[in-house]
Amino acid sequence: MPENHLYSAQVDNSDTGKLQINVTSTLGLIPIENATVTISYTGVPEVAIERLTTNSSGQTQQIDLPAPPFEYSQQPEEPRPYSEYNIMVEAPGYETVMVSGTEILPEVTALQPIQMTPLAQQSGLEEDIVIPDHTLYGEYPPKIPEEEIKPIDESGEIVLSRVVIPEYIVVHDGVPEDASAPNYYVRYRDYIKNVVSSEIYATWSENAIYANTLAIMSITLNRVYTEFYRNRGYNFTITSSTAYDQKWIRGRNIYENIDRIVDTIFANYLSRPGVRQPIFT
């Protein structure tokens, strides 16, 4: 049971989803024990509904939270299929972190990573992370068409990757020409988990999640393999813009089933007969 249950179920959320928070230090990803985690509805941030404490692994227990009906995430143009929560994390010696907009879907477990910066490295100000609308619910620019690099008509197939799978990629958090947008070094697997969680719903069938994950990995590895942006004078691997690449959202939550699927197939991608590089699906 939660350590301190303070509020009843959110109105109109007839289903439930699960949430677990994982808290680590930005220095060496060391787990932070005894961090205080306060959860509230994004629309009512001043009212705490749960207070939790992290264990020696930096994790909270899994808790149930109200979420919209499962059916909302199975059909387009339904009401928003996820509920949004704020998560505030406090720990002695660390900068407080506030995440606004953690997305809870019904019948799946959301995993919210939190990285805390030691106060010695910062000014003591709170770090705020705002998770925007999911790409299937919000308004995002459509993909700009690109020339087909591999003009082969046969359908793609899953092959064991011979392309080097990078440990990290550099994500430009904006459109390519925006020099003011920051670059982030992100572990490849973490990047894929983030994008899959941002572009599809974790409530979809396992086959649909597998298929979309393979497509997302293929797009990413195509950018890596072809040095697409570096050959154009940029110092990053891929952007977070849906107009150019695929949506990556700094600090967002992922989901337990997506986490597992990516770990299972992260070295695979889609290819075509006679074509060396991953296809840009």
Which residues fall in each region the model found?
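Intrinsically disordered, serine/threonine/proline
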Residues: 1-2, 26
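Structural motif
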Residues: 8-10, 14-33, 40-44
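A short, solvent-exposed loop/turn motif at the edges and junctions
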Residues: 70-100
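Short, surface-exposed loop/turn motifs at beta-strand boundaries within globular domains
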Residues: 14-16, 30-32, 45, 80-82, ...
